[in-house]
Amino acid sequence: MVMAHFVENFWGEKNNGFDVLYHNMKHGQISTKELADFVRERATIEEAYSRSMTKLAKSASNYSQLGTFAPVWDVFKTSTEKLANCHLDLVRKLQELIKEVQKYGEEQVKSHKKTKEEVAGTLEAVQAIQNITQALQKSKENYNAKCVEQERLKKEGATPREIEKAAVKSKKATDTYKLYVEKYALTKADFEQKMTETAQKFQDIEETHLIHIKEIIGSLSNAIKEIHLQIGQVHEEFINNMANTTIESLIQKFAESKGTGKERPGLIEFEECDPASAVEGIKPRKRKTFALPGIIKKEKDAESVECPDADSLNIPDVDEEGFSIKPEANQNDTKENHFYSSSDSDSEDEEPKRYRIEIKPVHPNNVHHTMASLDELKVSIGNITLSPAVSRHSPVQMNRNSSNEELTKSKPSSLPTEKGTNDLLAWDPLFGSSLESSSAPLTSSSSARPTTPLSLGTIVPPPRPASRPKLTSGKLSGINEIPRPFSPPITSNTSPPPTAPLARAESSSSISSSASLSAANTPTVGVSRGPSPVSLGNQDTLPVAIALTESVNAYFKGADPTKCIVKITGDVTISFPSGIIKVFTSNPSPAVLCFRVKNISRLEQILPNSQLVFSDPSQCDSNTKDFWMNMQAVTVYLKKLSEQNPAASYYNVDVLKYQVSSNGIQSTPLNLATYWKCSASTTDLRVDYKYNPEAMVAPSVLSNIQVVVPVDGGVTNMQSLPPAIWNAEQMKAFWKLSGISEKSDSGGSGSLRAKFDLSEGPSKPATLAVQFLSEGNTLSGVDIELVGTGYRLSLVKKRFATGRYLADC
């Protein structure tokens, strides 16, 4: 079978083959990016599966270790861990493959740019033959018309003068027609030669591209095949282990580990009663009046057997009158063990002390007081929220914690001030002044959650002073006030430390985080927001949405691309549903929201919201960066927003801003060039625009395009193509285009033309402004994903739009 070549199949009457082949080459970049996205998605799935298997393996360790089946859980755990490692190895291989695809994509872009320069001559030849074809067709029609006119005059018997004029016109049309035929022949030869070479070049590029893509796919399939072979080996090993785990071996292990001994009870013979022994055996039992309740039952069970010694029955020492003797112990031991503790006497010959015990009955007058106390106790218990069991501390540890608490109270702490060195654009009031914290004591009983950035303990703000001096309006400078969150009462004998000066009124840094409570012990909260009620539980994954918004600012100077100035910035906003606020407030330690920013190689600078977002500056990955949020600060901020707008169904929080590295005019999605021709009576204007898909990660449609051009000089009339609107009050011409993409006419290239009649000319060339936007895409290629559990990403919205997009002549 003979392969169909590009040289043979891309000609046609309209000579559009070059355009089709060129765009096919550009689609190769899209296929490369989509292949990288596919492999990345597969790696994400494998990573999630590996984590789930690891979690399952850990849960197998928590299953019951009692019974004969217990050793089987070790087999399950080992097999599951190996399966998790297999999938984790596949993730590593896929990540290496993604880097290879991205590297190939970068080389592909460079190759396509070089090819574009090489085939520029072919593009000119295509345009030339299209123009000469149109001119030839018109000259042919003119020639036929003149010939027909001459023949008509001859047949109608026109005057010789008219016939002579018609003959002159016919001869002139004939010469023009022949001239265009000759030009067409020369242009056709040049076009065929260049088009043949270019078509072959495009075919070579496509063959190389497909070969490389197939090699990448082969590497992908081999990696998956190797992992599946390893998984098969793990399953075989599991089958063999289960085959070796016989019922006999399980029963034998249980008997060896849990066996109680091989000696069976001996025979007991009847013995005659010895009165002396019987009296001594009865005497200790009469002295058990104040012994422990559990011991009495043991002695009743043992009465059918010979009386064992006192030590084996754990009977306390009694005096001659039958009272239990309280063992001697120091104060700490007494507090630790209460009356259950026993201490050995230094001398067995020492005479024990005697204690007289007196039980006082309840006085009748205290009955009502007792009932009232019981009622108060029931009310108190009803208001208590159960928390997870807290491990007991020894008195030494409690004393140490108390010392630390007193030391912390004496030394107020403050968070370091962090400011961005370079501001991108005007920051939101949320990013106002630097974060400063007031002094706050650390509670000794609370501990920070392991997953939160708070490592010392619960930060409790001091109580609000009776009178707070108000800051001047100049210091606030448009910064929205964030209220101080609710502070738990401080149970301390010492007075609270004074409030440190704040950079802002009610600084959001004074945020309290309560002690770590398990989410499992917190009741589910039913939340209703608007027409669609949402039931959110603390164990459910909470939905959040993320918006990536980028702004491209550009200044074009004439038609010189080297004078173009470009600046691209971006914002990341997280949207929380209104129902999540009750979940946060009902759980003192909500799950930390962590997110990862990917594809950051093109970013020059990232500025997180220092009051709400933390990051690790030591991260070494140049293409990703992880962030996590201060959940207490987020809760306070969301509560503030809900108070300002209670009816809102969701609340937006700006988390970070970034700046994208630009490459001049190549980073602008719409290239501009303006031309002015000004005279005393008229002004001619032309604006050339060109769609630039190379500025975007994936070419997308530019919509809502608006062009505004101010023209002075007293405009009396305007003629424009395409039609524009003239605003006489503002002295501006206004164009509005529906959309531009690479599928538009001429690949998204075009011109705006206008002619203005003036009464007070000449005009002065002015700066024009352009606006447009694009949904579902970004210029930087930045992407975001959630890391960890507790939250799910319900929506990711991407868009970019113009900021200050200006052009001068």
UniProtKB/Swiss-Prot annotation:
Residues 3-274 are annotated as: Mediates dimerization and binding to membranes enriched in Pi(4,5)-P2 and induces their tubulation. One of its GO terms (biological process) is synaptic vesicle endocytosis. Residues 87-156 form a coiled coil. It is a peripheral membrane protein. There is a cross-link at K297 (Glycyl lysine isopeptide (Lys-Gly) (interchain with G-Cter in SUMO2)). Ubiquitously expressed (at protein level). Signal peptide: none annotated. Residues 435-456, 501-520 have a biased composition (Low complexity). It is found in: Membrane, Clathrin-coated pit. Residues 390-416 have a biased composition (Polar residues). The modification Phosphothreonine is found at T385. Residues 520-809 are annotated as: Mediates interaction with DAB2, EPS15, EPS15R and ITSN1. Functions in an early step of clathrin-mediated endocytosis. Has both a membrane binding/bending activity and the ability to recruit proteins essential to the formation of functional clathrin-coated pits. Has a lipid-binding activity with a preference for membranes enriched in phosphatidylserine and phosphoinositides (Pi(4,5) biphosphate) like the plasma membrane. Its membrane-bending activity might be important for the subsequent action of clathrin and adaptors in the formation of clathrin-coated vesicles. Homodimer; disulfide-linked. May form homotetramer. Interacts with AP2A1. Interacts with EPS15, EPS15R, ITSN1 and ITSN2; recruit those scaffolding proteins which in turn may interact with the adaptor protein complex AP-2 at the plasma membrane. Interacts with DAB2 (via DPF motifs); mediates LDL receptor/LDLR endocytosis. This is F-BAR domain only protein 2. It comes from Rattus norvegicus (Rat).
